[in-house]
Amino acid sequence: TQQLVKNVTGDNQNTVKRKVMEIYRAQELEKRYEKDEILEAYLNEVYFGYSCYGVVTASLKYFNKDVSELSLAECASLIAITNNPSLYDPLQTDWGLENNRTRQLLVLGAMLEQEKIDQAAYDAAKEENVVFSNGYTILGGRVDVDTDKKDDTDTDGGDEQPEEETETATSSQSY
């Protein structure tokens, strides 16, 4: 809750006054909202790198999928990024990919320990081959999908058929 308050207010001063205000605001939020609502708000505000704010843009950036299509392993990999987007970035470097995997396993382990998932779900997620995709560009939290598609409107009166949509080249990494 305090992290949500910090993200929303944008106050990054390292002062006692800021911290006290953050605690107070967090307590006020917890009086008004359920934990699930606070978590949802946090997940829609948290930074994932590449100008991605929120899980919706992050799922498109890192997996080229809608957030509703993510597996447990992919969700844990995204959550891993929030701790330190530069350190746990699976797309930048091999060590970022390795760091993300280590953190993903830590997230899954915490979920198992807190009984948010069972052993079978943990084992399946741990064994899943997670493939990261870099097929989308996120600009300012908005998704910019690059596709080449000819206009369906025939302006010269010919019998030319519209070209089929071509996919943009993507790069990917996996563990």
Question: Residue spans of the language-model regions?
Answer:
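Non-catalytic, structured segments within soluble enzyme domains
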Residues: 1-175
